[in-house]
């Protein structure tokens, strides 16, 4: 199963709130993430930068389904105000995706 990684950036004054909210992610959102096939999902933080890593068979299909989900829409609104633009996101891209160049299982 493919692994994906991308970067987000938190506003400096929102780091504590971001971490607090991720200690209590809504159960309905967790269920939806699993339903669309996301697994082994981790979020790492260094300063303002977040690295999100997960496994997923069909990225575009899952992101489209998550985008239509009302629970996810509410979560995105509540979290969206915590972020700054990521400098390396290109026009037309949703995320600053990273290419996996090595993996040891």
Where are each of the predicted segments found?
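Ligand/cofactor pocket segment of small-molecule handling proteins
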Residues: 1
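Hydrophobic pocket/interface hotspot
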Residues: 18, 22, 52, 62
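Short, glycine- and small/hydrophobic-rich beta-strand elements in well-ordered beta-sheets
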Residues: 30-51, 55-59
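Charged phosphate-binding loop/patch that engages nucleotide di/tri-phosphates or the phosphate backbone
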Residues: 92-105
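Tryptophan-centric aromatic hotspots in well-structured domains and transmembrane helices
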Residues: 26, 41, 75-76
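Short amphipathic alpha-helical segments
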Residues: 14-38
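Active-site-flanking beta-strand signature of metal-NTP-handling nucleotidyl enzymes
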Residues: 4-9
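An amphipathic, aromatic/His-enriched active-site/gating alpha helix that lines ligand/cofactor pockets
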Residues: 36, 57-94
């Amino acid at each position: 199963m493919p692994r994906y990684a991308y970067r987000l950036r938190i506003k400096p004054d929102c780091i504590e709130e971001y971490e607090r909210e991720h200690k209590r992610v809504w159960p309905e959102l967790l269920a939806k993430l699993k339903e669309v096939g996301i697994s082994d999902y981790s979020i790492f933080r260094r300063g303002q930068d977040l690295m999100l890593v997960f496994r997923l068979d069909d990225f575009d299909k899952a992101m489209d389904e998550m985008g239509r989900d009302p629970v996810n829409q509410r979560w995105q609104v509540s979290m969206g105000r915590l972020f700054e633009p990521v400098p390396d996101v290109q026009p037309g891209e949703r995320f600053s995706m990273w290419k996996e160049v090595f993996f040891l299982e």
